[in-house]
Amino acid sequence: MSITLSDTAAARVNAFLANRGKGFGLRLGVRTSGCSGMAYVLEFVDAPQPEDTVFEDKGVKVVVDGKSLQFLNGTQLDFVKEGLNEGFKFTNPNVKDECGCGESFNV
């Protein structure tokens, strides 16, 4: 099982955590949403829960809850700039289909 980050994503998460002034790491999860069924959730976490799995890559701790882990195993998190837009991009080998707008996915 693994979750990895690009150098750019790791630098961005570390910058956000430094600005925040505290935090254990980044929580990555999924929730029911959108036309394809699931959407990614990113939030800062101050402490993992007992049922969480913690991955560390490039100095960043990524916390994943047990239910989300089956859908996120092998995912790489990147941070990209496309024109005027910038944000996190997920490369998830478990995704079978995505909605046209790219906001949700199906596994």
UniProtKB/Swiss-Prot annotation:
One GO molecular-function entry: 2 iron, 2 sulfur cluster binding
InterPro entries hit by this protein: Fe-S_cluster_asmbl/transfer, FeS_biogenesis, FeS_cluster_insertion, FeS_cluster_insertion_CS, HesB-like_dom_sf, IscA_proteobacteria
Co-factor remark: Binds 2 iron ions per dimer. The dimer may bind additional iron ions.
Coiled coil region boundaries: none
Biological process terms in GO annotation: iron-sulfur cluster assembly
Gene3D superfamilies per record: HesB-like domain
Cofactor(s) this protein cannot do without: Fe cation
Transmembrane as UniProt keyword: no
Keywords, in A-Z order: Iron, Metal-binding
GO cellular component: cytosol
Key word tRNA-binding present: no
Sequence positions that bind Fe cation: 35, 99, 101
Origin superkingdom: Bacteria
Role, per record: Is able to transfer iron-sulfur clusters to apo-ferredoxin. Multiple cycles of [2Fe2S] cluster formation and transfer are observed, suggesting that IscA acts catalytically. Recruits intracellular free iron so as to provide iron for the assembly of transient iron-sulfur cluster in IscU in the presence of IscS, L-cysteine and the thioredoxin reductase system TrxA/TrxB.
Oligomeric and partner information: Homodimer; may form tetramers and higher multimers.
Family, similarity comment: Belongs to the HesB/IscA family.
UniProt protein name: Iron-binding protein IscA
